[in-house]
């Protein structure tokens, strides 16, 4: 799976990650979303996007435009809670150096958390 490839690339680069990191609703304390990866000790979340989700043959049954809008709303809600989100596209992961550089660049602007 693409998430596994990214996790291994970044772990090899010395980053510690949590997979399927739950994003909790402040009102209920329950997860409303799961990020593909979280860079431990930071507020940086990584989402790995394939193209199938945004195609007419996606599993949700929604039109591609509706999928994009739903993803945008989900990401906006996550960002309002103070998380930073870096999106990687599946075709980018064939260039390991690019993935590591993008994540390191994103880390330059993150908050360190316990």
Give the positions of each predicted feature.
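Surface segments flanking catalytic/ligand-binding clefts of nucleic-acid enzymes
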Residues: 1-114
């Amino acid at each position: 799976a693409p998430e596994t490839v990214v996790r291994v690339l970044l772990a090899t680069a010395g980053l510690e990650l949590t997979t399927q990191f739950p994003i909790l609703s402040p009102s209920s304390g329950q997860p409303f979303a799961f990020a593909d990866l979280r860079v431990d000790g930071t507020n940086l979340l990584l989402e790995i996007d394939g193209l199938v989700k945004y195609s007419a043959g996606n599993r949700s049954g929604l039109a591609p435009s509706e999928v994009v809008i739903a993803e945008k709303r989900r990401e906006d809600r996550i960002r309002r809670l103070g998380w930073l989100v870096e999106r990687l596209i599946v075709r980018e992961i064939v260039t390991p150096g690019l993935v590591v550089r993008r994540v390191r660049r994103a880390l330059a602007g993150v908050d360190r958390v316990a």
